[in-house]
């Protein structure tokens, strides 16, 4: 999901809110048929946001670039995130290029795994894997 950061401001949890609360604000709902755990998909998203200054775009532009850059044969777009059966849901909070954050929710456990800037995701979760730059 890509959601403008302003939509989290009315919640005391901020970016840690349950993603279903802002699913109607998401520019894109993308399902990628592979493991979504933070050590893989979290780091992939962080690497992508930092590459080529991708994180500096508004939500609509960021979403279209995300789909373009991350698309592969087992990638699907859905009209709503609640139609996707997945363990981890990531929200990229757009709207301020200097303060971009990503939240990760474990949908099976119904808990927020993290809310971090891309650099912190990499420093916390990077492992010895064959990531895409």
Predicted regions and their residues:
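Generic ordered-secondary-structure signal
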Residues: 24-31, 36, 86-90, 102-104
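Adenosine ribonucleotide-centric catalytic and binding domains
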Residues: 27-51
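Intrinsically disordered, low-complexity regions of eukaryotic proteins
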Residues: 6, 15, 37, 75, ...
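Alpha-helical interaction segments
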Residues: 21, 38, 78-81
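Short, extreme N-terminal segment that most often corresponds to the first beta-strand
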Residues: 1-35
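Intrinsically disordered, low-complexity segments enriched in glycine/proline and serine/threonine
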Residues: 9, 42-44, 90
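Low-complexity intrinsically disordered segments
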Residues: 46-133
């Amino acid at each position: 999901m890509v959601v403008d950061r302003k939509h989290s401001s009315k919640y005391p949890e901020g970016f840690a809110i349950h993603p279903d609360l802002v699913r109607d604000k998401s520019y894109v709902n993308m399902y990628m048929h592979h493991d979504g755990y933070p050590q893989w998909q979290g780091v992939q998203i962080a690497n992508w946001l930092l590459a080529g200054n991708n994180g500096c775009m508004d939500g609509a532009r960021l979403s279209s670039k995300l789909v373009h850059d991350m698309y592969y044969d087992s990638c699907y777009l859905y009209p709503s995130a609640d139609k996707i059966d997945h363990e981890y849901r990531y929200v990229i909070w757009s709207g301020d290029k200097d303060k971009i954050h990503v939240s990760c929710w474990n949908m099976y456990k119904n808990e927020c795994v993290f809310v971090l800037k891309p650099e912190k995701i990499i420093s916390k979760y990077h492992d010895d894997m064959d990531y895409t730059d």
